[in-house]
UniProtKB/Swiss-Prot annotation:
Expressed by the venom gland. It holds the Pfam family Toxin_7. It is found in: Secreted. This is Mu-agatoxin-Ao1a. One of its GO terms (molecular function) is sodium channel regulator activity. Negative results: does not affect mammalian sodium channels (Nav). It comes from the Eukaryota. Insecticidal neurotoxin that modulates the insect Nav channel (DmNaV1/tipE (para/tipE)) in a unique manner, with both the activation and inactivation processes being affected. The voltage dependence of activation is shifted toward more hyperpolarized potentials (analogous to site 4 toxins) and a non-inactivating persistent sodium current is induced (site 3-like action). Interestingly, both effects take place in a voltage-dependent manner, producing a bell-shaped curve between -80 and 0 mV. GO terms for cellular component: extracellular region. The presence of a 'disulfide through disulfide knot' structurally defines this protein as a knottin. Belongs to the neurotoxin 07 (Beta/delta-agtx) family. 04 (aga-5) subfamily.
Amino acid sequence: MKAIIFFCFLSVMVFIVAEASSLEALKIFEGERDCVGENGRCRDWYNDCCDGFYCSCRQPPYCICRNNNG
């Protein structure tokens, strides 16, 4: 009985650690890609171009950030 309880406890701990590490990795990835500058690749649905730029998808799947003024 103690072995079953220990196994359940261990499984829960492994799940918590795995979930926490995947969330941390996601935060790191999002932090690396704060915004994309002019002529950088972007994703239209993600709105990842810097201020003053918009994501243009004239030739999908290669969308690029273009200047709002021209």
